[in-house]
Amino acid sequence: MKKKNLLAALLAGSLALSLTACSSDTAPEGDPQAGGEGSDPFQVSMILKTNSSEFWRLIQAGAEAYEKEHPDLVKLSIKGPPSETSYEEQLNMIQTDLGTAEFDGYLIAPLQSDAVANQIANTDKPVMAFDTRIESDKCLSFIGTGNKEAAKQGAKAAVEAAKAAGWEKIQCIEIAGVQGDATNTARMDGYREGINEAGGEFLDNEVQYANATADLAVTAMEGIMGKFPDGVAIICSNNDDMAIAAASTAKKNPAYANTIFLGFDGQLSACEAIANGELTMSAAQNNYDIGYKAVEEMVRVLQGGEPKDFVDTGTEIVTKDNANERIERMSGYLK
């Protein structure tokens, strides 16, 4: 019997009861191996925010690792637009796949959560969000990092590092991502709370939006140095690429010699920069696990398991003390 027929039989009643937004209660796990033999694998659409960066390649590597380990359970169709501002292209990809009858479920990392929520409003197939939440009663689960909490942990670590570096006035300016993006907002909220709770001051009026790109982060950092010629204790960024760009831009400015540059993601290039003393720290996501666990959770629910509200893939604060260990681990994932 095809697995999609199994899905229809098992989920006809349970989906109606469990489609309670991405905030439903955690429920017992199903057996991830059930129904694997003698039936076709589930067809799952997985749409990334982009497929042009290391961060998303690691997520894809994790997803493909699960697929490779369980070829009888799932077959993936993974795609993504060229950049994290390619909104229309991603929406078109999602719309196309929603209209494709062969897919049994959809894993989506939305660039625009509200727009995607509207797109999935009429689907009767399982939808799960990864990396960024989709606020919709059709979204069964969120798989990823608690962005606010991870940023908060990183911010508190940055304040302690700034104190150790000799800063008395601990102010923080953020070089932010895309204004209005849910992930960017969550990270900013976490940075603000972490800095302020640890005794620093998050300068809300000085936030610089850089659309999650290194080029605009350079421009933002140049503006910060012009406005704050005596230096700033902490520069936090929405992602590692921007943090590396900001640190590089300030490298020859003696007023910023002891500035703590905090990134987010913990990607390989950032870990190498931290190990080499070119970046101070990063609030690292376990992005390989995001991909792996997203597919794992989708398969479990397609087999009749109750969806979990949140599958937390964890956070790691990367500093010079543990950067090399993470480099070795991540390099292995990309082989």
What are these regions (language model features)?
Residues 40, 175-179, 183, 198, ...:
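Hinge/cleft segment of the Venus flytrap/periplasmic-binding protein
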Residues 90, 143-170, 214-218, 267-270, ...:
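Hydrophobic alpha-helical segments within soluble ligand-binding/sensing domains
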Residues 95, 99-127, 191, 210-273:
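Hydrophobic alpha-helical
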Residues 109-149, 267-275, 279-280, 327-329:
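Flexible loop/hinge segments that line or gate small-molecule binding clefts
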